[in-house]
Amino acid sequence: MMRYGSAATVTTSETASSQKPGGVCRLRLTLPAEASLRPKQEEINRDTSVNADIRSTNERRKKRNGYVLSEKNTAEPPTLHLYTIPKNNTPSAVASSGVVYGVVQRAENNHQNEVVVYEWSTNQLKEEMNYIKDVRGTLEKIREKMFGEYDEMKQKVKQLTQEIKVSSVQKEFLESHSQAQSTALDTFGTINSSLNAASIEMQKTLVDMTLENTNIKDEMKNIKHSYEESLVRLKEKQQLLDSAQNENQLLKVKIESSQEANAEVMREMTRKLYSQYEEKLRQEELKYTAEKDMLVDQTRQYLKAIEDASEKVRLAENKIEERDAKIAELDKLVHRMEQEREHLQDQLIRHEERIQDLDNRMQMQSPDRNQRLEEVATSLRERIKHLDDMVHCQQKKVKHMIEEIELLKKKVHYKDLLIQQLLERIAFLEGENTELQDKVDYLMANKPKTDKETKDIGTSCNLSESQRILTVCVTENEARSIFSI
């Protein structure tokens, strides 16, 4: 084994021929780092010895991890050998300074002439030998522990085989028990079919809900599209009003510049322009009222659609509550099934104990009967296992149904938020419409009824009408801009 933390690493290996004539001791050696100052031949031998010792330590680590039980069973020869050669051919000759000289020679046939001489202190060799003895003792303890565990496992296997053989007694009781198990399996089959039907109904309702959600999405897209179109129309009308306002300003400038020169011509022109702009204003007012009525109708339709959607959401919530109640009933049923399974397992354990007592008394007098009872017991165990699988499957189904209901609740909550936002926007638009209507009514009420008196009656009339047109255009422009915002 390897010892870490020393300047030179020494590994021992006991073999059948460890005792050699002349007091020679065989050791496995890894060269120290200070040997780099030696001649070139010694460096080559050191590299080969280090590689060989790494391989040997890897093999010994595998042995220590459990691949081989003990180092004493290895039949491989050591890779390197260390021989302590006594001084003057005497077996007990050691240097006066406590140093042991060793000769390292390869065991291969093609390296018989490679020999290297090294030296170690006796204290270091003693420490390495004590470390190796401790490691061997620990390995022996581990081997004894492993063999003891193996014997315990054999005894446990024997006990288990005896317990399996013991479970083949009292045929009549087991037959009645098997009938009870078969009836329980039939009831569980009916429960499984009812659960499958409930899951199919739930899937159908989920499909209906998805279709309703898609219809609501399409309606919301149509509403958004119509709202965008109305905004575009309002922008166009606002542009027309801006152009009319600019024309009015130009006409006002022209009228002011040519008041004294062409009173009659300007009067006729202003009358024509006034009639034209008054006609345009009436048309714009009619269009505005028509668009306003259309928007009111659209808002009513939207409110109706929102009410329908809220009604559908309420129905979906009622369905979800019903499904929650069904899931609670299924949970109770699964709990009762688990309690029944535990009760049956307890009965099976008690009957097995009674069978064991009877078997100890009867000492296996009827092997055919015992074989039949063993078959019945195995069939009962299989049925119990099948029952456990069914309970586990039902629990999975219930969990999946609960997850689907939670997801559906989240979707319904999201739809409620969306409907609330739409209602807020509709209320905001209605408030803006009422505000605009109030402004228009106020401006129409404050419109001047009499013309201002000036020197030129025609110009005064034209100026008052132009001012009225300008005020109406400004109010319409403000209303359009506010509504577009």
From Swiss-Prot:
Start and end residues of each stretch annotated as Disordered: 1-21, 40-65
A GO biological process held by the record: intracellular signal transduction
InterPro entries to which the protein is assigned, alphabetical: Tuftelin_GRINL1A/MYZAP/CCD68
Ranges annotated as biased composition (Low complexity): 1-18
GO CC aspect terms: cytoplasmic side of plasma membrane; I band
The family this protein is said to belong to: Belongs to the MYZAP family.
Protein's recorded name: Myocardial zonula adherens protein
